[in-house]
Amino acid sequence: MINNSGFAASEITCDQFLPSFGNVLVAGDALVEKDPETVDGFCRALNKAIEYIIDGHVEEAVDMSIEKYAPTFAEKRDVVVQILNDVFVKTLWQSDYTAENGIGASNPEKWQALINKSKEIGNIDETFDAAELLYTPAK
């Protein structure tokens, strides 16, 4: 975005030091326990939308989003399309793991490695089981 605004900038991605894996959705334990249908429905809807975008509908999704929700991004449309194509579609939303387990699937081994690394570099005081954080929606 900065480069496209006429300013030269280099990028240091967090993945070089502390990787992230796709989308992160947060729901409290109470909501998950009280209304799992809503949590599951939201996850399924998001995954369906991501699959649709990946399947060649990036420009359509950006145009609809600008029109309905973010009209101030109209002048940045082409940059947003480029970012979605270059980052989200190619690497953030898809991986070998999601190819095998479906869009939106979380790799517990990678999350555990991230938790362990976070302890190692002092971001957290104690490690814990990644399974405590991961939720798999009903099919």
PLM regions and their residue ranges:
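Glycine-rich beta-alpha junction loops
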Residues: Q16-L18, K68-Y69
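A bilobed periplasmic-binding-protein/Venus flytrap-type ligand-binding module shared by bacterial periplasmic
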Residues: G22-T38
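Hinge/cleft segment of the Venus flytrap/periplasmic-binding protein
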Residues: A113-K139
